Amino acid sequence: MVSSHISFALASRGLSVLHVGCDPKHDSTRLLLEGKMPPTVLDTLRRREFDISSVSLDDIVFESSFNDECSGRIYCAESGGPEPGLGCGGKGVVEAIETLKHLDAFGRLELDVVLYDVLGDVVCGGFSMPIREGHADEIYIVSSGELEVLFAASNICKAVARFNARSGAQLGGIIGNLREMEREEQVLTNFAEHLGTQVVGFIPYSEKIKECSGKGVTLFQLYPESPECGAFRSLSESIWNNRTYAVPSSMSFKDLHQWWSQAKEPDGR
């Protein structure tokens, strides 16, 4: 949800964006394609018996249904994954990136931005490929102020730090996806500072976002003048203009829990 709105907001700035969904559920680009689920890279390769030479760019990359509303362009691709319970979930990410490279998608589409929407818990090496192999120059973590979500964010920070020497990957910051938790902005701001990074923007909790998801569109189609759209525009501007990067630290669950319990208090850190 958050990533598709960022892609739309960036394209509205006149940028050419490739949005690559890196989740076996292959639903990252759904709101950019009027609720449709495109054929995934992995499914396309399976149908061609993994003969990459038989795959064209048009087979796996699709223009957003809403490009006529943008001054830029949005292109969509979904990596895909195995059937539930079968195979490695990260295989689709590996195959997608290799196929896009083979087809020179990044050059032929004349892109300004490639956005990889990666599964939050880095439980498989395949999901970390955009970070590990240097495909992602900047990493942004979407997080609420909830304890378990912050722990997942901390683990991603650990992966960024681990791969920095290999790929130069750096953290651009935290995107606060608010869940109406008490003092949530304070918790997220302090969490970012604790890990040596920054919050680049906050997305308010909103029933409008749920409504748009159910209708298969972004907020920009139904509520273009809403405060929520304003938040996404501001966030996209912060990301595009950001020049502050970090090799973050991380926390164990025990340390995080102790810190989090104090951080929720007034002026807690």
Segment roles from a protein language model:
Residues 28, 77, 96, 117, ...:
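Residue-level signature of catalytic and energy-coupling elements of molecular machines
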Residues 24-26, 81, 120, 180:
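Short, glycine/acidic-enriched loop or turn micro-motifs at the edges of active sites
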Residues 1-5:
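Phosphate-binding Walker
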Residues 161-269:
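C-terminal lobe/tail of nucleotide-utilizing enzymes
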Residues 81-91, 147-148:
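Flexible beta-alpha connector loops of hexameric P-loop NTPases
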Residues 12, 102-113, 118-205, 209-211:
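Conserved catalytic-core segment of NTP-binding enzymes
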Residues 6-75:
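N-terminal phosphate/diphosphate-binding loop that engages ATP/GTP or pyrophosphate donors
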Residues 83, 92, 97-108:
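Hydrophobic alpha-helical segments and helix pairs
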